[in-house]
Amino acid sequence: MTVRDLGIPDILRHRGTLEVLDRDMVEGEAVKDIYLRAFTADVYLTSANAISEDGIIVNIDGNGNRVAAITWGPKKVIFIIGLNKVAQTVEAALSRARGTASPINAQRFDIKTPCQTDGICHNCNSPESICSYVHFLRNSRNKGRHVVVLVGENLGY
């Protein structure tokens, strides 16, 4: 939501010189096509659920498309991260991802999980769990592929 809240997809779309792959602009099977096409993108814009003070980026994903693209595929991955997502340790970053971002995402996507109901992570293993994939990015073997833009304000959740 950070990238969308900043209006970046609309800005890029209005330039008219780029193809913007945006799952929120399509429905049904076309969403899956966007997920697959993201692997061959020149640039993948995303945020993170959390980042530790020593730079470990933590993301939790329901389908795995985002963490897969972060790991492999697009030529460059740019993270735009607000200060509210910075945690002191990787353990605190994981706790933030599970306890803050996941319940909000479950509500956003209307996923029927315990956290969607009460906003508290129950570490559930429900078939609809939005926490199927937990991803830690601690370095990048491809120099320059991962770029972090840390914005000095609260962005996203």
What are the roles of these predicted feature ranges?
Residues 1-46:
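N-terminal active-site beta-alpha-beta segment that forms phosphate/nucleotide-binding
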Residues 37-157:
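Conserved phosphate- and dinucleotide-binding cores of soluble alpha/beta proteins
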